[in-house]
Amino acid sequence: MKNFNLLVVSSILLVDLFPTNCGHNVHFSRAINLNGVSFNNVDASSLGAAQVRQSASRGRGLGENPKDEEGADKPKKKEEKKVEPKKPRENKLKQPPAGDGAPEGDGAPAAPAGDGAPAAPAGDGAPAAPAGDGAPAAPAGDGAPAAPAGDGAPAAPAGDGAPAAPAGDGAPAAPAGDGAPAAPAGDGAPAGNRAGGQPAAGGNQAGGNRAGGQPAAGGNQAGGNRAGGQPAAGGNQAGGQPAAGGNQAGAQAGGNQAGAQAGGANAGNKKAGEAGGNAGAGQGQNNEAANVPNAKLVKEYLDKIRSTLGVEWSPCSVTCGKGVRMRRKVSAANKKPEELDVNDLETEVCTMDKCAGIFNVVSNSLRLVILLVLALFN
């Protein structure tokens, strides 16, 4: 019985000591890798999904109210509030009492103002009252001439269709009404605005604002603002000729700038595309280089299986790890084995199971030691 037990143990140990190409250790290493993969790659997505479903069902069960669901389709009646009628707004503005300098009604002349106080505006059709010294004259009504202003005060603007009153010494002339000539300005004062582009009186005066872009009369005058957005001409130009089209130049510059920006964007996109293409090409080259087997390894394996190599794929050159396999090309199917070279073969990299490595060596050494101990002491 003792000898039988020794024989069984020895046979088991001898079977375990077989080389790896016999298949025993390969299957053992596969089992180890399989166990490691199963232990490490635990997929917790199913557990997470179960927890989400459980939480959703629990929340639905706690938050549901069947009465609310039944009554959800029924419209809720809102309590209508009674709208109180709004009180009409009253004009709470205080009307100024009639007194000295108060405005008069239509057709009545305005009262003369005191010294230092502005004259009241006259009604339509009535002449404005003369203003006191140092006070601006009141504007005249439509169709009536404006009153003359006092010394040092600007003249009032005339009504439509009436000539403007002359301004006092040192004060600017008032603007004339539509269709009427502007009043002469005081000494050293700019001329008023003129309708229809009337020329200003006197030399060395700044041209007023003119409609239609008419030039100002007289030399050494700066061109005023003209309708149509035309730029003013420089000094010492007769007739206020418009300058070269600055807007056109600006538009061209803007167009060039926009085109440059668009070109820059296209160039940037092109560079990005080229970079992406180069990256893709580099990855493809790396993959091809990884799939190309070593020429030395191919030649050595060809010398081993030269006599048995055909048009079918040969076994992998290794039992574990990365190796190479090969076959004849169709054009070299009838060649003799001695005439075959690397150009007549199709090769590719083959990957087998990972080798057991140090674990396999240690286990085989322990089994050998146990077998020797049993054999020597029995």
Curated annotation (Swiss-Prot):
Lipid linkage positions (GPI-anchor amidated cysteine): C355
Description of post-translational modifications: During host cell invasion, proteolytically cleaved at the cell membrane in the region I by a papain-like cysteine protease of parasite origin. Cleavage is triggered by the sporozoite contact with highly sulfated heparan sulfate proteoglycans (HSPGs) present on the host hepatocyte cell surface. Cleavage exposes the TSP type-1 (TSR) domain and is required for productive invasion of host hepatocytes but not for adhesion to the host cell membrane. Cleavage is dispensable for sporozoite development in the oocyst, motility and for traversal of host and vector cells.
Chain spans, region Region I: 92-96
Localization: Cell membrane; Cytoplasm
Comp. bias intervals (Basic and acidic residues): 65-93
Keyword Nucleotidyltransferase on entry: no
Species for this entry: Plasmodium cynomolgi (strain Berok)
Chief subcellular location: membrane
Gene3D superfamilies tied to this protein: Thrombospondin type-1 (TSP1) repeat (2.20.100.10)
Skewed-composition ranges (Low complexity): 96-203, 228-251
Name under which the protein is recorded: Circumsporozoite protein
Glycosylation positions in this chain: T319
Occurrences of domain TSP type-1 (ranges): 304-356
Region Required for the binding to heparan sulfate proteoglycans (HSPGs) on the surface of host hepatocytes: start-end pairs: 81-89
Location of the region described as 11 X 9 AA tandem repeats of P-[AE]-G-D-G-A-P-A-[AG] in the Swiss-Prot/TrEMBL record: 97-191
Region described as Disordered: 50-288
Spans annotated as 6 X 16 AA approximate tandem repeats of N-R-A-G-G-Q-P-A-A-G-G-N-Q-A-G-G: 193-268
Bias (Gly residues) ranges: 252-266, 274-283
Signal peptide span: 1-22
Repeat positions for Sequence: 97-102, 103-111, 112-120, 121-129, 130-138, 139-147, 148-156, 157-165, 166-174, 175-183, 184-191, 193-208, 209-224, 225-240, 241-251, 252-260, 261-268
Cellular component GO terms held in the UniProt record: cell surface; cytoplasm; plasma membrane; side of membrane
Underlying gene: CSP
